[in-house]
Amino acid sequence: MADSETPYHPDPEDLRRIPVDLFASKKLPGLSSGDLGFADSSEHLVFILRKSSSSLKSLLDSSGVPLFSISRLHNGVWELHKGDVEKRKDLVLTVKRTSKRFSKTESEVSFAGESSENLVIKGVPFQKSCTIYSQDSIVAQTSLMYKLRQIYVGRSKFRLTIFPGSIDHSLVVAMVAIFLQG
């Protein structure tokens, strides 16, 4: 009986194996006009995507500190650098659109300095739907927020599910932002 009264403490290793859901919307509290916010299930703001221009964006943490700058180059090529837009530091990754058929888009993510691991993003930007693959496994996936008995599904809110693995959540959010901008 003494064993049943002791409180349960989950193993931190087990917690790292649980998928994380972030909810994206432009209407979260604390966002400026034009910002896209990513909140956890408790509606606490985790990341902010701020648009500087059509080709420049910044990914900020919840306190407004710049994590990455996202810049569009040409022909569907995007670069992700550490730091804010004015002080772009180290190149982290490059995203290149490899296929666009009708509404489906496919992009390849190449990490700077690492030629071994490339990711592939496949989906439909208009429907806020994409899946990020690392070889055979799914890294993350987005989907619109469906409700029961809802005929029309708005595209202003969507869910980002990040599956357990070795990729930082802020990188996944940046890749999704790049994919949706296209």
From Swiss-Prot:
<dbReference type="InterPro" id="IPR007612">
    <property type="entry name" value="LOR"/>
</dbReference>
<dbReference type="InterPro" id="IPR038595">
    <property type="entry name" value="LOR_sf"/>
</dbReference>
<protein>
    <recommendedName>
        <fullName>Protein LURP-one-related 7</fullName>
    </recommendedName>
</protein>
<comment type="function">
    <text>Might be related to the phospholipid scramblase and tubby-like superfamily of membrane tethered transcription factors.</text>
</comment>
<comment type="similarity">
    <text>Belongs to the LOR family.</text>
</comment>
<dbReference type="Pfam" id="PF04525">
    <property type="entry name" value="LOR"/>
</dbReference>
<dbReference type="InterPro" id="IPR025659">
    <property type="entry name" value="Tubby-like_C"/>
</dbReference>
